[in-house]
Amino acid sequence: LRKVMFRQIEKLLFLLPPEVSHNLAITSLKTLGAMPGPIKPILGTKKKVLGLDFQNCLGLAAGFDKDAQAVEGLARLGFGFIEVGTVTPRPQPGNLKPRLFRYPDHEAVINRMGFNNLGMDAMVKKLNGIRARDRLKGTIVGVNIGKNKDTPLERAVDDYVIGIERFNDLADYLTLNISSPNTTGLRSMQTGDHLERMLDTVKNAQSRQKKYVPLLVKVAPDLNKENAEYMCEKITEYELDGVITTNTTLDRPSNLGQNEEGGLSGLPLFQKSLEILKLFRSNLHPNCPIVGVGG
């Protein structure tokens, strides 16, 4: 019965534009989260990673709940961890609509959202409310941080430092998103002096906080072997706490979305994401955690 109901709901949602469906899902999850009582993740294979006790290893990646509006509702679904964001210091509308495209025959989506979000002030307020209610019993909450579109690349690291300072007391872990393809120039922060300056600055910011909160970096699936190995070298050198592989890809199968700009996710990304995960696993210290995303 549950499967039949899900298929019917899916059919109804697919009659609506993708972004409308997404917003409707967030609204529904907010209602679910407002139900009384404590909220616990489904007990699965418990892991202690990043110094945190994960009740199960299945998490929700950033990008779904950009503004931490539905954390409690999502937690009711049983996730071991939920990553909210990407959030930027100042609110921004993102790219022009339409900017989200479904390809159900390929089990894929292309998006060029552009870090649309309500800004850090709004998310701090949301997370403060969640912490004050104290209903999440074991669900790990991470915050994914990005730079504003109009922040020059040479000052981009400042936006990430602001995020570390704003969310250090509210997040269980923090993710540095330097791999979205939908913010001009952002991926260059994965290379050369940009990466080294970034890691040096954020680790210094992390060390200044009263509480140690793990810092992870989210990487692109489109890195070549040389760039990936360089990232691993610097991640190890600066003792970053973990890596998330991967963000969306700019590559396209020949029969999918050739005319749409943006990042491709879903089944066509799986193999590429898996190869990057293997590459990072073989070049990082065995104790460096990797979160697998994509596909």
PLM segments and residue spans:
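An N-cap/entry alpha-helix motif that binds or orients negatively charged groups
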Residues: 4-48, 111-116, 120-121
